[in-house]
Amino acid sequence: VNGLTTLSIQLTPDSSELNEIVVVGYGIQKRADITGAISSVKSENFNKGVVNNPGELLQGKLAGVAITSVSGEPGANQNVIIRGVGSLRSGTQPLYVVDGFLLDNSSTGVATNPLNFINPADIASIDVLKDASATAVYGSRASNGVVVITTKKGSGQGQVNLNLSTGVSSLPNQLPVFDAATFRKQVKAVGGTLVDLNGNTNWQDELTQVGVAKNANLSMSGAANNKFSYFASMGYQDQDGILKNSNLKRYSGKLNITQKALNGKLNVDYNLTASRTENLRPAITSVISDMITLNPTIPAYTNGQPTALPTNSLNPLRRNQIYKDLATNNRILASISPSLQLAKGLVYKLNFGVDYSATNRDIQYKPFPSVVNEGNISNGTLDAIFDPNTNQLVENTLSYNWSLKSHNLTFLAGHSYQDLRDESRTYSFLGFVNNAVEPRYQDQTSTVTFPTAASVGAVRNELQSYFGRVNYAYANKYLVTATFRADGSSKFGANNKYGYFPSVALGWNVTNEGFMANSFFNNLKVRASYGVTGNQEIPSKITLASFSENRLATGAGSFNTYPLDPAATTIDKYPYGITYTRLANPDLQWEVSSQLDFGVDFALFNFRLTGTVDYFSKVSSNILLEVVPADPIQPTSTFWNNIPDMKIVNNGFELALDYNSDPKGSFTYNIGGNVTYIQNKVVDSPYAVLVTGAAQGSGQTGATINGYINNEPIGAFYMYQFEGVKDGISVYTDTNKDGKVLDNDRAVVGSAIPKFIYGFYSNFNYKDFQLGLNFNGMSGSKVFNHTNMTLFPKALLAQSNNTTDFAVQYPNETLANANIVSTRYLEDGSFLRLNNATLAYNVQPSKVGLGNAFQNIQFSVTGQNLFVLTDYSGFDPEVNTGSTSGGIQTFGIDRFTYPKARTFLIGLNLTF
């Protein structure tokens, strides 16, 4: 990946699958001994192509794991939801563990995705821990599941691999806005005022581009005398976005060394990852809005320069010339892990690591005096943002393995300490010299206005943990796993610093029983588990009281006037005051998630058909939420508390199947797929509606779109039901039949969360040719097309703004008709996507006279996002699931979302 790794699909069907090594919390186990729900994907089965995020490698591959793109921007985040959404404000993303190092989800890194620093070409495998038995050993950060990323290590004879690829990306489909001729007719037809500059401009063509992607990865690996092994790599990626002025560059380096001494009793792992990421972004919201609403009769250019708009606003082509948003992130993740065998079966291990990330982000407008309708752009602006973050981890573990005849017992005990420090400094400047020098390179102390705003913040969080695990197996038939973790976090109050997270799991390898000797099952294992995990992804310091100093600035009613006398006009009348901005809550507790899982693993037809079936029930309780005080005399408007009775429930089924053909012959194949059904709802909520999504824009700001509603699905859309247009005005359902349509006539009309998540794949080998296909999809979800509501009302068409047919679908609709939040803008979000297809050809070096130079030569062609089957009218049904409303996760709202690209790549892989 990210340079198109060699396709090497293993099709040998035998019991080796049971001996497959799976990464679990603080260790490894054979697949046959696993009692929890763990899904694994090796590097040879990753999705191919331009990949910025490890989540993209897995999309469509795993049951129970919904992976969606927040947007199509290069480096955009991936929302990874494991077994349903289980929290409101305290984080919905899994814990990421990279080579044993626990990442901090709150460290954002580059302006988009905190995992951009990892080169996907360096990853050997990804294991997803789904049930509480597998995740409870990680305690307070495991309620949303755990994603364990293991990078490549060296083995065998020395080898050099060079992977090169290049390709192009483009906008798959344009929104069907009017061309100039149709636009002229439609503006007149609705009785509007036509502004006609005699042009014929397709603004979607003007503001998008065919982006070029270039990738290069060089790696070296090997081992010597079973005492020393190494893997070293360098990577380069340069990816243009499909919007102009959109680009991601990443320079990466990786070094993994394993050294053994004392006759193999001492083993030391060194891991080093270094990266530099440069992320260039356009003014996305403005660009998306302009390219679908700008008057098509306005020529893009006049006399070689972007045409001045009649509104005195910025021509978006001019905006691209003077606007720049560049974030540069430098990151180093380094760890050392020595382990020493103290006695037979007894091993001590130290894991020490540091993750340092520093981001500099400059958002600037060069001065452009001709603009009068866009704030301070005419003078030039600069926002300079500095975000250094440090994550230090020290872990000590002691493990013991004991075996006697049919009994096998393994103990693990450990202590972990993690120190997380996040800083942020933002400075805003206004007024720059209008010359060829960018504002960020000018002397800010000489600007017309010194820093107009400055903000500085720093937080430190500490986490101390004690954990243990016991694994017992009898005769390779009966398996028991028990784990326990105690986490103490500085985020919580003095009365509840520690949370306690136990789990237990049972397994039965039925095929090892005597009565199964002649069974058609090659493998049959039954699993059951129950456990409790936690969630501490909440803002820092919220258990502590905070205060604000208020002082008189200028004049009566000044914003900074001490509130006891808002009419004060002199400095000697209440000049200073201290007020509460947050109440202390030393009783704030951990949010917890309890999960029950029943599973079956099976294999048939000499291990050619393998599969898993799981039922799970996940209940999140003790919900953490910022609430309004019950006492109206409280000195603050909100404070953080646990909602004792409220629960979020996710129940579901998972099915995953994989089939390998007979490995004999020149043609072989592998097909597989997975499907997940999830039923979720909010239970015993004391609130009528907890808003997760609210409208934005003129006349609609704050109007509820979706939220958490008692006994309804998560992300339930709550709005008026649109029936049509009568006498020029929208008609809505009178739900309670009282003859009036008011707020209480709003109803739940669907959910943004899909009921079914599915994916399927196929790999075909014929002689030296290989073809791989990967599909993914969702069903049962809705999308609110906020773009339609904001940009395509008939009234805006009448003002010479472009629209689609959506604006004129009701000819008798008046220009004064309000476009309120309703099912008029709610659409089916179901889709099926061919997200990846790769055709590869392996050249046998010996047959072309290159056997002495190369071990392998492979050419490949890859397509990404090749087609989408959907009824959704927007750019793409995967929308901005990464946004928040008041700190609560928002789902299923499409508002000016950056479109996903369609990409084609050619690649060359050389192994020396």
Stretch-by-stretch model annotation:
Residues 1-273, 333-334, 546, 590-591, ...:
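Short, small/polar-rich motifs associated with maturation and membrane association
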Residues 161-196, 425-428, 542-557, 660-752, ...:
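Conserved small-residue
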Residues 193, 448, 489, 727, ...:
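Extracytoplasmic gating/loop element in the C-terminal half of outer-membrane beta-barrel translocons
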Residues 98, 195-225, 229-237, 305-341, ...:
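Outer-membrane beta-barrel transmembrane strand signature
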Residues 222-224, 240-252, 265-287, 330, ...:
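Small-side-chain secondary-structure face that scaffolds active or pore-lining regions
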